[in-house]
C-alpha cells in the first residue's frame, strides 16, 4: 500500500512539474523547491547518521 501511495505521489508531482515548467516564470520557483528538498534530505540523512552513531556508542 505504501508503494502505491508513493508511486501516485510521485506521478502527481511529476505531472504538476511538467505543467508548471511550461511557464518560464515558474522556473525559479522550481529550482528553489528542489534546493529546499535537497537540504531537507541532507538534514534527514545527517540526523539518521547521528542516531546510528549514538545507538552504536550506547550499545557498546
Swiss-Prot record:
Subcellular location: Secreted
UniProt keyword list: Antibiotic, Antimicrobial, Fungicide, Secreted, Signal, Toxin
UniProt GO BP: defense response to bacterium; defense response to fungus; killing of cells of another organism
Cellular-component GO terms for this entry: extracellular region
An example molecular function term from Gene Ontology annotations: toxin activity
Tissue occurrence: Expressed by the venom secretory cell of the spine. The spine is a cuticular structure containing a single large nucleated venom-secreting cell at its base. It is an independent unit capable of producing, storing and injecting venom. On the back of D.vulnerans caterpillars, spines are grouped together by 50 to 100 to form scoli, of which there are eight in D.vulnerans.
Predominant location: secreted
Coiled coil: none
Residues of the signal peptide: 1-24
Family: Belongs to the limacoditoxin-2 (cecropin-like) family.
Function in brief: Peptide that induces pain in mammals and has insecticidal, antimicrobial and antiparasitic activities. Induces irreversible paralysis in D.melanogaster when tested at high doses. Shows a moderate antiparasitic activity against the major pathogenic nematode of ruminants (H.contortus, EC(50)=24.5 uM). Has moderate to potent antimicrobial activities against all Gram-positive and -negative bacteria tested, and against the fungus C.neoformans (var. grubii), but has no activity against the fungus C.albicans.
This protein's name: DELTA-limacoditoxin(2)-Dv12
